[in-house]
A protein has these predicted regions:
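Domain-terminus/edge residues, biased toward the C-terminal soluble/receptor-binding domains
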Residues: 1-168
Length: 168
Protein backbone atom coordinates (compact mmCIF):
# COMPACT_ATOMS: atom_id res chain seq x y z
CA UNK A 1 0.00 0.00 0.00
CA UNK A 2 2.87 2.40 0.64
CA UNK A 3 3.62 2.25 -3.11
CA UNK A 4 0.15 3.54 -4.01
CA UNK A 5 0.17 7.36 -3.80
CA UNK A 6 -3.64 7.47 -3.57
CA UNK A 7 -3.60 5.72 -0.17
CA UNK A 8 -3.71 8.44 2.48
CA UNK A 9 -4.87 6.74 5.65
CA UNK A 10 -4.09 3.44 7.30
CA UNK A 11 -4.89 1.75 10.61
CA UNK A 12 -3.46 -1.68 11.28
CA UNK A 13 -4.04 -4.20 14.00
CA UNK A 14 -3.60 -7.80 15.04
CA UNK A 15 -5.42 -9.95 17.54
CA UNK A 16 -5.12 -13.68 18.01
CA UNK A 17 -8.89 -14.04 17.52
CA UNK A 18 -9.31 -11.58 14.65
CA UNK A 19 -6.07 -12.12 12.76
CA UNK A 20 -4.33 -9.33 10.90
CA UNK A 21 -6.64 -6.38 10.20
CA UNK A 22 -6.28 -3.24 8.12
CA UNK A 23 -8.40 -0.20 7.36
CA UNK A 24 -7.12 1.94 4.49
CA UNK A 25 -8.49 4.98 2.69
CA UNK A 26 -7.54 6.18 -0.76
CA UNK A 27 -8.52 9.10 -2.94
CA UNK A 28 -8.30 9.24 -6.72
CA UNK A 29 -9.71 12.40 -8.25
CA UNK A 30 -12.95 13.24 -6.43
CA UNK A 31 -13.54 9.64 -5.38
CA UNK A 32 -12.61 8.36 -1.92
CA UNK A 33 -12.88 4.72 -0.94
CA UNK A 34 -12.27 2.91 2.33
CA UNK A 35 -11.29 -0.75 2.54
CA UNK A 36 -11.56 -2.88 5.66
CA UNK A 37 -9.80 -6.24 5.81
CA UNK A 38 -10.17 -8.52 8.81
CA UNK A 39 -8.90 -11.99 9.55
CA UNK A 40 -5.90 -12.06 7.23
CA UNK A 41 -3.20 -14.62 7.91
CA UNK A 42 -0.25 -12.20 7.67
CA UNK A 43 0.75 -8.56 7.45
CA UNK A 44 1.57 -8.98 3.77
CA UNK A 45 -1.74 -10.71 2.99
CA UNK A 46 -3.80 -7.94 4.60
CA UNK A 47 -1.97 -5.33 2.48
CA UNK A 48 -2.49 -7.37 -0.70
CA UNK A 49 -6.19 -7.86 0.09
CA UNK A 50 -6.69 -4.19 0.89
CA UNK A 51 -4.98 -3.06 -2.32
CA UNK A 52 -7.11 -5.50 -4.31
CA UNK A 53 -10.31 -4.13 -2.73
CA UNK A 54 -9.32 -0.54 -3.46
CA UNK A 55 -8.36 -1.32 -7.05
CA UNK A 56 -11.65 -3.18 -7.56
CA UNK A 57 -13.65 -0.28 -6.10
CA UNK A 58 -11.95 2.36 -8.22
CA UNK A 59 -12.28 0.21 -11.34
CA UNK A 60 -15.96 -0.69 -11.03
CA UNK A 61 -17.48 2.29 -9.18
CA UNK A 62 -17.69 6.02 -9.83
CA UNK A 63 -18.61 8.91 -7.56
CA UNK A 64 -20.82 11.80 -8.67
CA UNK A 65 -21.69 15.09 -7.02
CA UNK A 66 -25.47 15.38 -7.13
CA UNK A 67 -25.97 18.60 -5.20
CA UNK A 68 -23.64 21.32 -3.98
CA UNK A 69 -23.86 22.62 -0.42
CA UNK A 70 -26.04 25.69 0.15
CA UNK A 71 -27.31 25.83 -3.46
CA UNK A 72 -31.06 25.89 -4.06
CA UNK A 73 -32.49 22.67 -5.45
CA UNK A 74 -36.12 23.55 -4.73
CA UNK A 75 -38.27 26.61 -3.98
CA UNK A 76 -41.42 26.17 -1.91
CA UNK A 77 -44.41 28.39 -1.13
CA UNK A 78 -44.48 29.76 2.42
CA UNK A 79 -47.71 30.95 4.02
CA UNK A 80 -47.98 33.85 6.50
CA UNK A 81 -44.40 34.98 5.88
CA UNK A 82 -42.57 38.18 5.06
CA UNK A 83 -41.48 36.37 1.87
CA UNK A 84 -43.58 34.14 -0.37
CA UNK A 85 -41.09 31.30 -0.76
CA UNK A 86 -38.14 29.55 0.80
CA UNK A 87 -35.19 28.04 -1.02
CA UNK A 88 -34.25 24.52 -0.01
CA UNK A 89 -30.94 22.70 -0.39
CA UNK A 90 -28.47 20.45 1.37
CA UNK A 91 -25.98 21.77 3.93
CA UNK A 92 -23.08 19.61 2.68
CA UNK A 93 -22.24 18.36 -0.80
CA UNK A 94 -24.27 15.28 -1.71
CA UNK A 95 -22.06 12.69 -3.38
CA UNK A 96 -23.04 9.15 -4.36
CA UNK A 97 -20.98 6.22 -5.57
CA UNK A 98 -22.57 3.90 -8.10
CA UNK A 99 -21.48 0.99 -10.24
CA UNK A 100 -19.98 2.38 -13.44
CA UNK A 101 -22.62 3.09 -16.07
CA UNK A 102 -25.51 3.31 -13.58
CA UNK A 103 -25.46 7.09 -12.98
CA UNK A 104 -28.25 7.76 -15.51
CA UNK A 105 -30.49 5.34 -13.60
CA UNK A 106 -30.39 7.34 -10.34
CA UNK A 107 -33.79 8.60 -9.27
CA UNK A 108 -33.78 11.58 -6.88
CA UNK A 109 -36.99 12.45 -5.03
CA UNK A 110 -37.89 15.04 -2.43
CA UNK A 111 -40.15 14.62 0.57
CA UNK A 112 -41.40 18.09 1.51
CA UNK A 113 -44.43 18.96 3.65
CA UNK A 114 -47.38 20.18 1.57
CA UNK A 115 -47.82 23.33 3.66
CA UNK A 116 -45.01 25.50 5.03
CA UNK A 117 -45.92 28.25 7.47
CA UNK A 118 -43.60 31.05 8.63
CA UNK A 119 -41.50 31.62 10.58
CA UNK A 120 -38.80 29.43 9.07
CA UNK A 121 -35.21 29.71 10.30
CA UNK A 122 -32.21 29.51 8.00
CA UNK A 123 -30.81 25.99 8.33
CA UNK A 124 -34.11 24.55 9.59
CA UNK A 125 -34.78 21.00 8.39
CA UNK A 126 -37.77 21.12 6.06
CA UNK A 127 -37.79 17.71 4.39
CA UNK A 128 -35.43 15.25 2.77
CA UNK A 129 -33.97 14.27 -0.58
CA UNK A 130 -33.58 10.57 -1.37
CA UNK A 131 -31.70 8.95 -4.21
CA UNK A 132 -32.67 5.48 -5.35
CA UNK A 133 -30.99 3.04 -7.70
CA UNK A 134 -32.78 -0.12 -8.80
CA UNK A 135 -35.52 0.57 -6.24
CA UNK A 136 -33.13 0.85 -3.26
CA UNK A 137 -32.36 4.05 -1.37
CA UNK A 138 -28.61 4.63 -1.72
CA UNK A 139 -28.45 8.14 -0.24
CA UNK A 140 -30.65 10.38 1.87
CA UNK A 141 -30.02 13.88 3.20
CA UNK A 142 -32.08 16.49 5.01
CA UNK A 143 -33.35 19.44 2.99
CA UNK A 144 -32.73 22.66 4.88
CA UNK A 145 -33.94 26.23 4.46
CA UNK A 146 -31.26 28.29 2.75
CA UNK A 147 -32.93 31.55 3.73
CA UNK A 148 -34.97 32.66 6.70
CA UNK A 149 -38.62 33.62 6.26
CA UNK A 150 -39.94 35.76 9.08
CA UNK A 151 -43.52 36.10 10.13
CA UNK A 152 -45.52 38.39 7.88
CA UNK A 153 -47.56 41.38 9.04
CA UNK A 154 -51.06 41.14 10.45
CA UNK A 155 -52.89 41.52 7.13
CA UNK A 156 -50.56 39.09 5.34
CA UNK A 157 -51.16 36.46 8.02
CA UNK A 158 -54.92 37.07 7.92
CA UNK A 159 -55.06 36.88 4.12
CA UNK A 160 -52.97 33.71 4.00
CA UNK A 161 -55.11 32.13 6.72
CA UNK A 162 -58.18 32.74 4.55
CA UNK A 163 -56.42 31.41 1.45
CA UNK A 164 -55.23 28.30 3.30
CA UNK A 165 -58.79 27.69 4.51
CA UNK A 166 -60.11 28.18 0.97
CA UNK A 167 -57.55 25.71 -0.47
CA UNK A 168 -58.32 23.01 2.10
Amino acid sequence: LWRDPSVDGIKTGHHSGAGYCLMASAKRGDQRLVSVVMGSTSENQRAVDSQALLNWGFRFFETHRLYDANKAISKQKVWKGDADEVQLGVDAPMLVSTPRGKYAQLKPSMDIPKTLVAPIAKGQKIGSVKVTLDGKVIAERPLVALNAVGEGGFFKRLWDELMMWWDS
